[in-house]
Amino acid sequence: MEMESSLPHVMLVSFPGQGHISPLLRLGKIIASKGLIVTFVTTEEPLGKKMRQANNIQDGVLKPVGLGFLRFEFFEDGFVYKEDFDLLQKSLEVSGKREIKNLVKKYEKQPVRCLINNAFVPWVCDIAEELQIPSAVLWVQSCACLAAYYYYHHQLVKFPTETEPEITVDVPFKPLTLKHDEIPSFLHPSSPLSSIGGTILEQIKRLHKPFSVLIETFQELEKDTIDHMSQLCPQVNFNPIGPLFTMAKTIRSDIKGDISKPDSDCIEWLDSREPSSVVYISFGTLAFLKQNQIDEIAHGILNSGLSCLWVLRPPLEGLAIEPHVLPLELEEKGKIVEWCQQEKVLAHPAVACFLSHCGWNSTMEALTSGVPVICFPQWGDQVTNAVYMIDVFKTGLRLSRGASDERIVPREEVAERLLEATVGEKAVELRENARRWKEEAESAVAYGGTSERNFQEFVDKLVDVKTMTNINNVV
């Protein structure tokens, strides 16, 4: 215990969403492996209890990770989860500020040296400032999306408005223009989820507070955007440290943050398939398509002659939504699961392509696994990520423009895109581009690579008491 109390202690605070928990927990494991103590904090609901059950987590118990340790803490936010994001955020901020302060006090014999949050809990920066603890942020979207929010907040270019909803946004980095339905949709005045954009903008307002903005990307992938933002905001320390899931592969640890136990025989089933014969399908944890769109996708797969591994999650508890139903023929031809270890699935040679909602975690995992993507974005950063995969990274094909498109993509179009991504010259081109990005990603996290160097510099600051004291005096 004496040795553990002498290790530098970092506290990570995550918004309660799988797409936020996964990358922040990966970061936590990598930090811990360098010889630090990491306390990972999120709420009991809606995911904390499920995480415990799926991963046998014990609150407050230190588990060894590399040279250090990691533990979990969960707190009640007093909110019954429904579809009201505003109420969730208000409740989360009120309870979160109180509970994080209590946790910092609880571990005063292992003083918290740094607070790290993701962008959906921007108030963590305020707590750090109040307690005079240095802070950092993990940005779990692309640097391009960060730039879009920054440009919007500072009114550097014109964005769509209620009177001019179809403005094209000009940006000084690739792809140079973003159509009105290609910007992060939370910034569009017609978005029913604009309050989510408001939360992210609260983090943009606080970009001057953290001593480091860690970005889940890598220099080679978004070089011009990262360089542009570094020049535009010289007072902000932008550090691309991704892909985190590739970096985390080197750590031997059974710590996971999944909200469901993954299907145990996915890989065995893939082993029984021919190379490049399976379409992997997942729309993340929150995107929930209409049943008639699910029907069209299912019949499109059947018409293509390909097999599929489809992650089909039940609706979140508390939401009045009927579970999806698939044709029996598809269930016989493919494999339907509620959850799987996506990074292992994407790395399997049987997987030909990925039909994805284009969340950034999925985008990074596909790019760094060398797998082409059929883009079916819904909202938020997904619509922007799709543009980059199709037009900039050149590893994707478009199947949808997003939920605002308000159309059901027919089965004929689904089958056509599936075959285009798996057979012929275009398929070869997509896979070759994806292979190149995979190599770039591996180089970035290898010893001496751009992400590895950025991450090591960040850890060196966490470990060095003098550096952290100086940072604290500045903030």
UniProtKB/Swiss-Prot annotation:
Top EC class for this record: transferase
InterPro entries: UDP_glucos_trans (IPR002213), UDP_glycos_trans_CS (IPR035595)
Residues annotated as binding an anthocyanidin: H20, G380
Residues the entry annotates as binding UDP-alpha-D-glucose: Q342, H357, W360, N361, S362, E365, D381, Q382
Lineage: superkingdom: Eukaryota
Enzyme Commission code: 2.4.1.120, 2.4.1.177
Catalytic activity: (E)-4-coumarate + UDP-alpha-D-glucose = 4-O-(beta-D-glucosyl)-trans-4-coumarate + UDP + H(+); (E)-ferulate + UDP-alpha-D-glucose = 1-O-[(E)-feruloyl]-beta-D-glucose + UDP; (E)-caffeate + UDP-alpha-D-glucose = 1-O-[(E)-caffeoyl]-beta-D-glucose + UDP; (E)-sinapate + UDP-alpha-D-glucose = 1-O-(trans-sinapoyl)-beta-D-glucose + UDP
One term of GO molecular function: sinapate 1-glucosyltransferase activity
Residue positions of the active site: H20 (proton acceptor)
A Pfam family reported for this protein in Swiss-Prot or TrEMBL: UDPGT
Keywords: Glycosyltransferase, Transferase
Protein family: Belongs to the UDP-glycosyltransferase family.
Physiological role: UDP-glucosyltransferase that forms glucose esters with phenylpropanoids. Glucosylates 4-coumarate, ferulate, caffeate, sinapate and cinnamate.
UniProt name for this protein: UDP-glycosyltransferase 84A4
Species name: Arabidopsis thaliana (Mouse-ear cress)
